[in-house]
Regions:
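Active-site helix of classical SDR
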Residues: 66, 101
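Active-site loop immediately N-terminal to the catalytic Tyr-X3-Lys motif
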Residues: 44, 92-96
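Substrate-binding pocket helix/loop in short-chain dehydrogenase/reductase
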Residues: 42-43, 50-52
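The beta1-alpha1 cofactor-binding region of Rossmann-like NAD(H)/NADP(H)-dependent oxidoreductases
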Residues: 5-16, 48
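Residue(s) in the substrate-gating loop at a strand-loop-helix junction
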Residues: 85
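C-terminal helical subdomain
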Residues: 125-126, 133, 142-182
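Active-site-adjacent segment of SDR/Rossmann-fold oxidoreductases
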Residues: 90, 111-121
């Protein structure tokens, strides 16, 4: 096990993490870009700082992650997976920054998939709906039992990795089976 700390918004830190990983483990076969945060509010209320924080973390961080691992993934014919959101195709009031970032992640990942599959690199994006996490200060509890659980996304990733190499699920939408009880 190798634990590293890096800010996804800092390309140099991403590159340093890749070098440390390759030095310790030898190669990089799988990359999962899963950093994300949300700043919500109407376009009138969202600040420049809030906007930049969301875009730099959720979208630019995904770009930096792929860019810094690309040569490694080419060598191993690896797999690059992004965790986007259903907010990457479904907009909502108060979601200007978050929607823009997740629409961007979805589009970026799909375009990268077209660019990289000719190199033998598989690229997929998983677009979950409501997931029981600590996102934006939420404390998972019984009230979140109806939501997708973190381990469900983990199982989905494992399923992707087990698929026959000739098959590429490029964009996967996943949502809770049942809506919340009112």
């Amino acid at each position: 096990v190798l634990a590293l700390k890096a800010d996804v918004r800092d390309y140099q830190q991403q590159q340093d993490a890749v070098k440390a990983t390759e030095s310790s483990l030898g190669s990089i076969d799988i990359v999962i870009a899963n950093a994300g945060l949300g700043v919500f509010g109407s376009i009138e209320d969202i600040t420049i700082e809030g906007w930049n924080q969301v875009i730099e973390t959720n979208l630019t961080g995904v770009f930096y992650t792929l860019k810094s691992t690309l040569s490694s993934l080419k060598k191993t014919k690896g797999y690059y997976i992004t965790i986007s959101s259903l907010a990457g195709t479904n907009f909502f009031a108060g979601g200007t920054a978050y929607n823009a970032s997740k629409f961007g992640v979805t589009g970026f990942t799909q375009a990268a998939m077209l660019d990289l599959r000719t190199h033998g690199i598989k690229v997929s994006t998983i677009m979950p709906g409501s997931v029981s996490t600590y996102f934006n200060g939420n404390e998972p509890s019984q009230k979140d039992a109806w939501k997708i659980q973190q381990e469900d996304i983990g199982e989905l990733v494992v399923d992707l990795l087990k698929m026959n190499p000739r098959t590429l699920p490029s964009k996967i939408e996943v949502r809770p089976s049942f809506p919340p009880t009112k």
